[in-house]
Amino acid sequence: MAEKGKGSFGYLKKQAIKQGLFALGLLAVCATIFLIGFFWLTQHNTILTVIAVLGMLPVAKFIVSMILFMKAERFSCAPHLYEEVMKIAGDRKDDLLAGFDFYLTSYDKNFPLSVACVAKDCLIAYTPSENCDCNKCKEHFEEYMKKNGISGINVKVFTDEKKFLERFKQVRDDETNENEKAMYRLLLNLSL
């Protein structure tokens, strides 16, 4: 299980803060460049104004990312679920292909996954969202598995926490193969 970055517990909340701080920092740099040009050259029609305006493009990108992460963070893994998963994982927690706080986006739907695990040739995931279309999520995974040459992995998305934990107990003891590792990398790549 990942301790930092995608797949780590609290990732969505940390990323929302990180994106916001980057946006504020870049906004301050752009404002400083504009104000230096305005007060130093006493007009706003300068190359420094152009640089400041072009600098707003990355600021806008970070603001959009921040908004996406802020929207997704309400689906972060609950602390009690994290503790339960870690308890079940036990001494295998470093070997398991499992992670927390995934938020997948597609053209027409978004899929928040609090916990996901790849083992025994299957991807199991839990979503706390009652509105998550589990069949669409499965189709989304299968489409990208096909595009990436991954086969033989069954996808199951649970909306019931207890059923997910029961299935997680069943798959936790299995050794991982290369196909499962490729599937987990795909999960990380598809997530925000």
Segments predicted by a language model, with ranges:
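Structured, soluble extracytoplasmic/luminal domains of envelope-associated proteins
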Residues: 122-154
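Hydrophobic/aromatic beta-strand patches that form the interior of the parallel beta-sheet core
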Residues: 156-158
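Acidic, Ser/Thr-rich low-complexity segments on the non-lumenal side of membrane proteins
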Residues: 89-126
